[in-house]
């Protein structure tokens, strides 16, 4: 499961076990028919196999639909929630801030906050919530600094780990089971192969370690990469390993596509020989073909030191999975990583420099390679007793801080004490008189035109002078919509047409909500209700 999926499973299980709430899950990568064994209602976002082709075409027509944009309003119209909880990246859940049904439910969002400052468009979306939780103390600090006057930041609900699953094993025994020399040192990482994960710098640092470390540790030390390769937008790992001339010192995890067996082997590019089924069909793990959790625990336990080398993290779950297994971490001392380092007694890697990223306008970091090299040396030079003590220290600290029960209590404390506002929870309230004006008055400036759009077409007067509205004025003034990677012509007619569709959709949804029109029971809603009823 993804990190968000793991979070949802652990939170929902505890909310359900409390027997205090009626629950529904909007499962993004599930079909409703897959939810028959779940004890709460499950609405699937993925199209059913027997749905009409036009539904599947609609699903594929907008990238946001994979995150739920195309079905969210139908789900809340059917379930009529008092409160909606979300916990994903800003770009995944931002569509909820535009929902016509926003007045009828209390919304608590825990977005990932991986850098400072946050994008202004995200801040505006966050401001539509009733409360904000964060994955890390860094997130709380950043949002209060950037927009404390706009946001109700109520706390931190960091993920937990199951200490009965993520736990230390005898390292030599695990290595022998995996076919590894029990007496070597292994520096490892578990990161997806993405731009923000600094694989080239990690490989470069390891190469320098091999040059400057004392012979008694460098000769029997290896780098283990548990990652995906190749990735469409990821690093060319083979190139960087070859460039640094460390080919014989880098290990990788491989999973066989044919027999599904996995092993740790020397890095041999993206396709490798499987000794179990004797086919050339072993690949490096990915989201679609990964390891089961008990096997991932073995990967962590094979390591002496775990490294999270990234420009930023919204949390970085593998760090606490590693420390729960008694493996100390070294991580970039920035964003959520700085909190994880503090709570797990890890090794903070100094920041060499900060820079602004063009895509997000956020501060990102390059950690200090030389400092990482020194951390590697210092840790591997510890005596066996000192390593054992450090392992116990990081394990104890992790179990004390990252607990799923504590995580769920943060959410439950808020749910049990919040006060609904205005129409929240009043799904049977009388119809709201909504009317849009299609005829634009003549002689308006761009500023007046945008104000008219928000007041008379979108019916969102409170947003008429926000960031999005201000940007629309600017775009109209220059005749183009300008975002990172996007420069497209825009004019009043195009903007009016788009906003008229949104305004008319708002009126239709309000009619359905108030009983003046009927919501067609799509297959996914019918299956969700049937499964829950059974």
Listing of model-derived features with the role each one plays in the protein:
Residues 328-331, 341, 345-348:
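Short hydrophobic beta-strand element within catalytic cores of glycosyltransferases
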